[in-house]
């Protein structure tokens, strides 16, 4: 049994365009976030069975903008995840890995207001179970000796992109969201104008992710990932996503 622990940090930015019922532009919502987390990885050496445990906290700074009106809030988010998988070799360079993951996440937003009125947020949380598999290449990612024709890079870089160690993968999954909770109350200064909304994320989604990683130096790996989530029942999430990663070891 091998065990690996570590900490990580991340920064993110998202921007969403909001449209009115008639399709016209209503405004934008932006979110800048910084995260700090820790992880524990366990691997059974003889079978390859692995488990990942992750705990993460995130600080959000959100801004909703429309014509002549802004709304800003800050909040804290948290996430806990337990994921496991068992890889099977189909060929020497192709692997199939069934996976199962449980995730619990929550969000606590500050109250806010704009020119139209106030918004009071409660504490929200949701649980997710993902079942799927990962199919991809299983090539040796050892960088080896440099082959660059440029003298300064001769020992640390490859002559061409085709010489880089590369792995690809695709990951289809089914995601079930349940026990989602969270209230939001909006109103104005007028007495009795307040209304409470209790949106739900409960439902089932189909998720497809694909990625590629390449070792460009002995200690540097670059990766890209893209995916699409489609809701098939309830009020579960739907949309596109993308991610680029840079991994440097010391």
Ranges and model annotations:
Residues 1-250:
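Membrane translocator/pore-forming domains, dominated by Gram-negative outer-membrane beta-barrels
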């Amino acid at each position: 049994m091998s065990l690996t622990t570590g900490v990580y940090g991340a920064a993110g930015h998202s921007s969403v365009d909001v449209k009115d019922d008639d399709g016209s532009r209503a405004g934008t919502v932006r979110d800048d976030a910084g995260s700090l987390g820790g992880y524990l990885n366990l691997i059974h050496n003889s079978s390859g069975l692995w488990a990942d445990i992750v705990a993460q906290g995130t600080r959000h700074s959100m801004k909703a903008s429309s014509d002549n009106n802004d709304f800003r809030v800050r909040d804290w988010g948290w996430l806990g995840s337990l994921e496991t998988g068992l890889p099977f070799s189909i060929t020497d360079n192709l692997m199939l890995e069934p996976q199962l993951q449980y995730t619990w996440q929550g969000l606590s937003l500050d109250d806010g207001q704009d020119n139209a009125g106030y918004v009071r947020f409660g504490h929200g949380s949701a649980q997710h179970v993902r079942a799927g598999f990962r199919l991809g290449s299983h090539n040796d990612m050892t960088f080896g000796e440099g082959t660059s024709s440029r003298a300064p890079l001769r020992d640390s870089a490859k002559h061409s992109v085709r010489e880089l160690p590369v792995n690809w993968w695709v990951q289809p999954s089914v995601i079930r969201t349940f026990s989602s909770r969270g209230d939001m109350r909006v109103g104005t200064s007028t007495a009795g104008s307040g209304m409470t909304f209790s949106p739900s994320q409960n439902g089932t989604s189909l998720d497809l992710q694909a990625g590629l990683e390449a070792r460009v130096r002995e200690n540097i790996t670059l990766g890209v990932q893209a995916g699409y989530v489609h809701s098939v029942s309830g009020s579960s999430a739907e949309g596109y996503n993308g991610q680029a990663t840079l991994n440097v070891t010391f």
